[in-house]
Amino acid sequence: MPPQLQETRMNRSIPVEVDESEPYPSQLLKPIPEYSPEEESEPPAPNIRNMAPNSLSAPTMLHNSSGDFSQAHSTLKLANHQRPVSRQVTCLRTQVLEDSEDSFCRRHPGLGKAFPSGCSAVSEPASESVVGALPAEHQFSFMEKRNQWLVSQLSAASPDTGHDSDKSDQSLPNASADSLGGSQEMVQRPQPHRNRAGLDLPTIDTGYDSQPQDVLGIRQLERPLPLTSVCYPQDLPRPLRSREFPQFEPQRYPACAQMLPPNLSPHAPWNYHYHCPGSPDHQVPYGHDYPRAAYQQVIQPALPGQPLPGASVRGLHPVQKVILNYPSPWDHEERPAQRDCSFPGLPRHQDQPHHQPPNRAGAPGESLECPAELRPQVPQPPSPAAVPRPPSNPPARGTLKTSNLPEELRKVFITYSMDTAMEVVKFVNFLLVNGFQTAIDIFEDRIRGIDIIKWMERYLRDKTVMIIVAISPKYKQDVEGAESQLDEDEHGLHTKYIHRMMQIEFIKQGSMNFRFIPVLFPNAKKEHVPTWLQNTHVYSWPKNKKNILLRLLREEEYVAPPRGPLPTLQVVPL
């Protein structure tokens, strides 16, 4: 037989388990590349698997090809997809495979006694006789088949059932197909799964259920939980509680026990850092099961049915809510008053002056009626810039409404005396930032210097201008005193002239007040109001600042509900 055709039979790589204890290096099993210029110059041959003859015509092909070298050389090129192997390496590989088979049979004497019934119809002695009768090439092919069957028996007896347990079984058909060239040989392909219950094919999911037989007992283990569980509120982080300040008991000190409503919402617009004066800075937690002593000092929101401070209760549901704009950061006395007006839940004594900020001059715990030994240390009051504005959309307090007052109805004129000059400047600034064109003499001194009388009469004769009277002890003295006492006080004379013009208009209107608004400034009392103005609403600054804005906006503080249909009467015959 030509050596080229024998090399064609011997050059395929077959996965065979080799005994590592044998003194044969593994490098001998690797094919040594031998390049031929004739083979590289020719185009690649088609796949020999679709053209290979069956096992019956194999000997005939061998005898025919032995006589013609050119025909054998063409068959070599068709069947050889890999590089040629030398004859010496092929013989060494055959010897290694035979020695490995003998070593395997010595270690496993029970496995080599007989072939399975599905693989061959002959027994062990018969197979040895067949091997002896075949030529050298067929003996090597038969030994390859037997080694493949031994490897399949070893993989079937292996206890490993993991993901890689089926790879050896699946590789056997591929190796057999490569060695046979896609055709049936003298010895049939072994069936390694005859003694196994079923195929352990891996599933698509490689998780906990990917092993059908569950050898390691993975299915009996508990599945791991997520790192953070949102199903259990007790696992959420708790708020920080200060240890420096003692907690107050609501049963013992009712004034301090301002509890939150039962349905606490972390997204409520009032859920900001509004605190009682002098109280520690407690953050409102979002846990529902946290002890309620943690938020005893948080101001609760204004609920429907609670009247606004400083307003006369004329109804049950206040709807008109004024959101104030503060003019400048140096206004230190108006911003604490905003907290008093915006949040009715803030406790305050009845006899506390309306213009005095809470706890500004006294101890921080006086308005809370707490014992002195339980009061916290005196903290610094929050700066005016740090006090946040009230929420623009408080819940359950009506709908927001933007006033559409025209520009000609936003003009305001203020008459005052010199003892309230500084407070009047703050009041004018407050009206300006809230959209009103406010005029006083010190802001229009250049225009006023042209003609003082005409400047005053321009606002007095215009019926659309609202006139605010700043009541003070000096104002009562200026308007009711003798003119001889005002000879040296030019401002007092102008105040007396304006008062007389207003009184004449009031009489002409039938003693009805349409545009005069008396406002009590600090250190003023009700008896300082002129007699003809006492039969009207008298406001206080800065206590009733929202009511003053509502009066200038021509809006009511309380709005009646819409009228419904008449009730249905049921007539019952006698």
UniProtKB/Swiss-Prot annotation:
Q: List compositional bias (Polar residues) regions by residue number.
A: 52-67, 170-186
Q: Which domain of life is it from?
A: Eukaryota
Tell me if Ribosomal protein is a UniProt keyword of this record. no
Q: What is the effect of changing D19N?
A: Likely risk factor for PSORS13; there is a reducing binding of this variant to TRAF6
Q: Which reaction does it catalyse?
A: S-ubiquitinyl-[E2 ubiquitin-conjugating enzyme]-L-cysteine + [acceptor protein]-L-lysine = [E2 ubiquitin-conjugating enzyme]-L-cysteine + N(6)-ubiquitinyl-[acceptor protein]-L-lysine
Q: Which GO terms describe its cellular component?
A: cytoplasm; cytoplasmic vesicle; extrinsic component of cytoplasmic side of plasma membrane; nucleus
What PROSITE patterns does the record point to? SEFIR
Q: Where is the composition biased (Pro residues)?
A: 378-394
Keywords in UniProt for this one?
Answer: Disease variant, Inflammatory response, Transferase, Ubl conjugation pathway
Q: Which GO terms describe its biological process?
A: B cell affinity maturation; B cell apoptotic process; B cell homeostasis; CD40 signaling pathway; eosinophil homeostasis; eosinophil mediated immunity; establishment of T cell polarity; heart development
Q: Where is this region: Mediates interaction with TRAF6?
A: 1-256
Residue ranges occupied by any SEFIR domain in the UniProt entry: 409-550
Q: Which effect does the record note for changing V319R?
A: Loss of E3 ubiquitin ligase activity
What is the enzyme's main class? Answer: transferase
EC number of this enzyme? 2.3.2.27
**What does altering P318G do?**
Decreases E3 ubiquitin ligase activity
Q: Does the keyword Transferase apply?
A: yes
- Pathology noted in the entry: Psoriasis 13: A common, chronic inflammatory disease of the skin with multifactorial etiology. It is characterized by red, scaly plaques usually found on the scalp, elbows and knees. These lesions are caused by abnormal keratinocyte proliferation and infiltration of inflammatory cells into the dermis and epidermis.
Q: How does it assemble?
A: Interacts with IKBKG/NF-kappa B essential modulator, with CHUK/IKK-alpha and with IKBKB/IKK-beta. Interacts with TRAF6; this interaction is direct. Interacts with IL17RA and IL17RC. Interacts with IL17RB.
Q: What is this protein called?
A: E3 ubiquitin ligase TRAF3IP2
Q: Which gene encodes it?
A: TRAF3IP2
